[in-house]
């Protein structure tokens, strides 16, 4: 009895028909290969007792010095943190969410990018007055802002006025108001502007979508939401995240004319720095003060004569300029915070002074803060860490930012053309390299070089991705448990990332999935499993167990071959037995055969057949062309290696 060994290479090849994928796996769902054996992808279990009430678009995880894990979840409308106590809403005050951040107007950009009728030019502020928790801004020229629009206030001398707010009323053409709970105060200077961090799609294959970016500064986290633009800071235990340079005050204690300020979080101030205190219960403490000492990360002192006393509450803010209207943030190994699209300049990369994310004084000769305005073809989109530095993308290019030391600190060189991202989050960093989905193919950065990445399922991706939702919601991540980069994208007609592909960068094969919608994901490492979210706001451990949060997956895990080359298709064959190299879990799988007598003829399905414990599977299949489907029957672990077919030649007819 002849035995035909089915030497099928790992991975899915997804051309138009099974015949075109001869001798390969043609279709699959949630399976992977390891050392030549076919395995099921793990299940997922919920770690949130209730869904978050906003769609998650980015996840980031880190640990403290005690190796306690934490994670933050950047949503369209909110920001959450997961600690040992569960999920907590830490959305910063005045946060501008995604659904109100995608504004536009005429005269400030290219035709068709922005909404007609709004002027995005900066308006100089003459006065800013806060009375009874209502701020009135007076501009030097008519502003043209409507009620309900978000407005970005920056550079006011009293920095407590700065931030993003919603316009409550427009008394005159040069005044508008917004609500802000703080002590009565007045100031001047600065500018008002409508945020334009996000824009309408410039074409069907690209839209500069909303995104969150995170990176840890030691035990703390820095963050930027592209719709909001502020550089945010969060320290575990704080009630909410807040703008860098601004801290909530626990109390101020004056003893012997020395005032000690205790803040709720790490303030980041330095000796001789000027800060503005507002809203403290003891009014004499409010005003602009000079830091005289910094006893700890959460305390500083200033001198003020008077009787010993204590005041509580309020806020303290640096008077130093902190960039606003930013696109993304990353922290380099040299301990510089880096902002992409900084200060509303879509081509600017700016970095803080070393070891101080609150020092952005670019004119200083005593720090290492600086910026570079790149000569790019298009605007900056996103950044990611790689072994040689920081990879930066524009809509169409890739740039590499490298540390070079004094006096220039960083250099930024263009290393790729026509290799832009499908969406701002459509990338995965893997072992110092980076893999990303472009607009028409996949790319890899490796060792300073950008090159196309061969993709056996590229047609499946780019023929099925939704041209409108794909540039908005496609995202990627490293798996972390397995050497794989995963990418989720919305299918035609869908607004949720409901299809996925994944690439094993060690064995160089591709897999596909169609039954697991995920809006964001993050690799294992800090946590034992990858983290992911679905469109309902549920948070999961991936690769945990074998079920879908307790629900069965079973036959949804499968791999289906293309045409099998038995006798080169020149004669009929009768297949009567299959010998399977099942490492374990043989009783958790089944085989279904598809046979036909001509390449274009109709197929006949035979089975499913259940493998026996001795490795044999009895079948009865006749045809000239054959295919086989391997599917799970249980939510359990299994493996299948090489298969051999026992067949009887039946002649040419």
PLM features: residue spans?
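Structural signal for beta-propeller blades
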Residues: 79-80, 229-231, 346, 398, ...
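Beta-rich globular "head" domains
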Residues: 143-150, 267-269, 273-274, 339, ...
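Structural hallmark of WD40 beta-propellers
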Residues: 68-70, 219, 388
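Short, exposed beta-strand/loop patches in secreted or surface proteins that constitute
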Residues: 72, 123-130, 166-170, 211-215, ...
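Beta-propeller and closely related beta-pinwheel folds
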Residues: 43-62, 201-207, 240-244, 320-473, ...
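Small/polar beta-strand repeat architecture
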Residues: 15-16, 90-211, 238-324
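Beta-sheet repeat architectures centered on beta-propellers
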Residues: 1-120, 203, 211-213, 418-653
């Amino acid at each position: 009895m002849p035995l035909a060994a089915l030497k099928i290479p790992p991975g899915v090849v997804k051309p138009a028909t099974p015949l075109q994928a001869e001798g390969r796996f043609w279709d699959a769902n949630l399976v992977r290969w390891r050392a030549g054996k076919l395995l099921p992808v793990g299940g997922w279990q919920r770690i949130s007792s209730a869904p978050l009430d906003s769609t998650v678009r980015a996840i980031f995880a880190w640990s403290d010095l005690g190796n306690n894990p934490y994670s933050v979840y950047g949503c369209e409308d909110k920001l959450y943190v997961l600690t040992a106590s569960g999920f907590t809403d830490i959305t910063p005050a005045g946060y501008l969410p995604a659904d109100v951040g995608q504004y536009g107007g005429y005269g400030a950009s290219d035709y068709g990018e922005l909404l007609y009728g709004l002027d995005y030019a900066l308006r100089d502020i003459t006065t800013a007055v806060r009375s009874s928790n209502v701020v009135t801004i007076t501009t030097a020229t008519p502003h043209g802002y409507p009620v309900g629009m978000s407005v970005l206030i920056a550079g006011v001398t009293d920095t407590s006025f700065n931030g993003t707010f919603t316009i409550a009323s427009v008394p005159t053409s040069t005044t508008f108001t917004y609500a802000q709970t703080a002590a009565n105060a007045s100031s001047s200077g600065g500018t008002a502007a409508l945020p334009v961090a996000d824009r309408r799609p410039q074409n069907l294959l690209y839209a500069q979508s909303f995104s969150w970016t995170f990176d840890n500064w030691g035990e703390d986290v820095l963050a930027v939401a592209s719709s909001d633009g502020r550089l945010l800071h969060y320290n575990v235990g704080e009630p909410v995240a807040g703008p860098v340079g601004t801290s909530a005050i626990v109390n101020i204690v004056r003893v012997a004319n020395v005032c000690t300020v205790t803040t709720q979080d790490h303030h980041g101030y330095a000796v001789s720095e000027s800060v503005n205190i507002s809203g403290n219960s003891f009014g004499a403490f409010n005003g602009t003060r000079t830091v005289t000492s910094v006893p700890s990360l959460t305390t500083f002192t200033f001198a003020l004569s008077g009787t010993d006393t204590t005041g509580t509450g309020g806020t303290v803010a640096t008077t130093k300029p902190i960039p606003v209207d930013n696109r993304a943030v990353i922290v380099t190994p040299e301990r510089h915070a880096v902002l992409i699209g900084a200060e509303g300049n879509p081509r600017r990369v700016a970095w803080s002074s070393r070891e101080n994310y609150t020092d952005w004084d670019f004119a200083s000769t005593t720090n290492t803060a600086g910026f570079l305005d790149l000569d790019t073809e298009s605007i900056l989109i996103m950044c990611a860490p790689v072994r040689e530095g920081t990879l930066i993308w524009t809509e169409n290019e890739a740039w590499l930012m490298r540390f070079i030391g004094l006096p220039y600190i960083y250099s930024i060189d263009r290393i790729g053309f026509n290799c832009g991202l499908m969406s701002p989050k459509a990338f995965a960093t893997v072992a110092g390299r980076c893999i990303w989905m472009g607009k028409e193919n996949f790319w890899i950065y490796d060792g300073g070089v950008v090159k196309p990445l061969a993709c056996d399922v590229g047609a499946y991706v780019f023929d099925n991705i939704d041209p409108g939702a794909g540039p908005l919601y496609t995202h990627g991540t490293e798996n972390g448990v397995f050497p794989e980069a995963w990418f989720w994208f919305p299918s035609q007609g869908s607004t949720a990332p409901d299809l996925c592909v994944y690439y094993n960068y060690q064995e160089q094969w591709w897999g596909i999935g169609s039954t697991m919608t995920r809006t964001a994901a993050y690799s294992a490492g800090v946590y034992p499993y990858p983290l992911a979210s679905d469109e309902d706001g549920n948070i999961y451990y991936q690769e945990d167990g074998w079920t879908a949060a307790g629900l069965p997956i079973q036959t949804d895990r499968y791999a289906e071959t293309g045409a099998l080359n038995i006798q080169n298709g020149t004669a009929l064959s009768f297949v009567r037995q299959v010998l399977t190299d099942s490492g374990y879990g043989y009783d958790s799988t089944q085989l279904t055969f598809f046979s036909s007598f001509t390449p274009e003829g109709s197929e006949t399905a035979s089975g499913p057949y259940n493998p026996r414990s001795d490795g044999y599977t009895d079948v009865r299949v006749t045809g000239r062309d054959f295919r086989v489907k391997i599917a799970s029957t249980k939510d359990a672990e299994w493996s299948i290696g090489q298969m051999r077919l026992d067949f009887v030649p039946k002649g040419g007819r």
